[in-house]
């Protein structure tokens, strides 16, 4: 299990800062896919009418986890940066710190 604190002091690339400042940490989440992106418009047009599925549907899934991406927002200048972590099954943001001799809880 990976437990990441909700704030961290790290380097800020913003024009005003360019030094280590406090950052607010959140987990990145992919936005909703646009219906008007060129690929989606082309796909929808191709799918129209008779003829069933026109493009291959991917079935050979190999990965069991996704890489965790952190979104760091500078408290001073509000500049946002992204930082990817390694793959993990369990990710926690701002959870309780681990105590010695304590049982694992999921």
From Swiss-Prot:
GO terms for cellular component: ribonucleoprotein complex; ribosome. The keyword Lipid metabolism does not apply. Gene3D superfamilies: 3.10.450.80. The keyword Lipid biosynthesis does not apply. One of its GO terms (molecular function) is structural constituent of ribosome. InterPro entries: Ribosomal_eL44, Ribosomal_LSU_eL42, Ribosomal_zn-bd. One of its GO terms (biological process) is translation. Keywords: Ribonucleoprotein, Ribosomal protein. Belongs to the eukaryotic ribosomal protein eL42 family. This is Large ribosomal subunit protein eL42.
